[in-house]
């Protein structure tokens, strides 16, 4: 998913309940997304696809600015999926959440080497908070995710970032 995001500007709304996880020796080996709620294209990447399929922007509401898509992908793939898998595995006692978070942080640092301009990865590693969808707040604001414009369909809140590291701890070599 990180390759698709950085190469083609595609982000998927992967939800934890739509993930199939293959375990080997009690640890994740392979992750499959059996379904997703939707997808986004980063506007700056979408020129060619929009020429072929202009309805992606007007009808599917699938194209958005980079900051918007960063926020959604950060929430759906990392906050809603990966961090919840880390929580579930950590609860087994085989390994701690902190150890798993360190593995994820290491992976993101490697990805930052590959994609040094990635605002997505920079946000995951350096921001003090991460976006999370406030389902109750969304309902209290009487928003309907199925019919509201994509940029206003949900209420997002900021919660502490468990992946945060200091920028001085990262080598860009």
Q: Would you name each region that the model predicts?
A:
Residues 10-12, 42, 49, 82-89, ...:
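Weak global preference for isoleucine
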Residues 98-173:
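Long, compositionally biased intrinsically disordered regions
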Residues 1-8:
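Conserved kinase catalytic-core helix
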Residues 20-21, 57-131:
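Active-site capping/gating regions of soluble enzymes
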Residues 10-68:
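Catalytic activation segment of kinase domains across protein kinase-like and atypical kinase folds
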């Amino acid at each position: 998913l990180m390759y698709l995001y950085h190469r083609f500007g595609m982000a998927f709304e992967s939800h934890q309940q739509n993930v199939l996880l293959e375990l080997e020796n009690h640890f994740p080996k392979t992750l499959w997304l059996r379904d997703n709620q939707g997808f986004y294209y980063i506007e700056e990447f979408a020129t060619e696809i929009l020429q072929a399929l202009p309805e992606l922007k007007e009808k599917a509401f699938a194209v958005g600015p980079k900051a918007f898509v960063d926020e959604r992908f950060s929430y759906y793939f990392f906050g809603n999926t990966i961090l919840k898998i880390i929580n579930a595995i950590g609860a087994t006692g085989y390994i701690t959440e902190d150890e798993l978070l360190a593995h994820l942080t290491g992976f993101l640092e490697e990805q930052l080497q590959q994609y040094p301009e990635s605002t997505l990865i920079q946000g995951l590693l350096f921001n003090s908070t991460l976006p999370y969808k406030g389902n109750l707040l969304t309902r209290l604001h009487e928003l309907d995710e199925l019919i509201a414009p994509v940029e206003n369909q949900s209420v997002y809140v900021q919660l502490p970032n468990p992946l945060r590291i200091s920028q001085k701890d990262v080598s860009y070599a």
